[in-house]
């Protein structure tokens, strides 16, 4: 959950990709979406969604990776000169969301400090890093996921065109590899 990379859906400013992701849980509840999107930090956006989780879209578990991928792509391409640099600084090292309780989005260390879990967020970020390396266009069109009821504030979410200002320049930093013992694959 990294703040500092705002997203625009039309003229709606969303401060974090986590807020957009959480809002997408509730396409049928525009007031809940507004409350989530008003939050300034990723964590408070997530916490704002918690009381409403039982009202999540019926297919949430089936579509959450697709929606997170879409949110992260918007985050990257609307913050191209900064977020692409952050991704490139990871070089070719694994990106792991280390967590103490979420083995789906992250990976949990065991008593020997080996990480176990799906690491879905880390995998999506590595996928995005590879995509960013292969972008040579001046603009990118991000289509919405092909989902029923993909709405924000009661309106269909449009595809988004991002104009890339310039290719990011990267200052390489020294990194250490994570000790990943086992990671399970997930499907799109």
Model-derived features: positions:
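Charged, low-complexity intrinsically disordered segments
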Residues: 1-188
């Amino acid at each position: 959950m990294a703040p500092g990379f705002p997203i625009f859906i039309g003229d709606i400013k969303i401060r974090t990709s986590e807020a957009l992701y959480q809002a997408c849980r509730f396409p049928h509840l525009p007031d809940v979406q507004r409350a989530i999107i008003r939050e300034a930090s990723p964590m408070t956006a997530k916490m704002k969604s918690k009381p409403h989780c039982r009202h999540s879209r019926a297919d949430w578990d089936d579509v959450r990776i697709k929606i997170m991928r879409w949110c992260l792509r918007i985050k990257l391409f609307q913050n191209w000169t900064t977020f692409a640099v952050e991704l490139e600084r990871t070089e070719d090292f694994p990106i792991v969301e280390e967590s103490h309780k979420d083995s789906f989005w992250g990976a949990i260390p065991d008593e020997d400090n080996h990480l176990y879990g799906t690491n879905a967020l880390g995998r999506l970020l590595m996928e995005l890093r590879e995509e960013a390396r292969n972008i040579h266009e001046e603009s990118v069109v991000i289509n919405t996921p092909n989902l029923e009821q993909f709405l924000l504030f009661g309106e269909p979410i449009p595809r988004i065109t991002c104009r890339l200002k310039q290719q990011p320049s990267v200052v390489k930093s020294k990194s250490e590899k994570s000790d990943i013992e086992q990671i399970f694959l997930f499907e799109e």
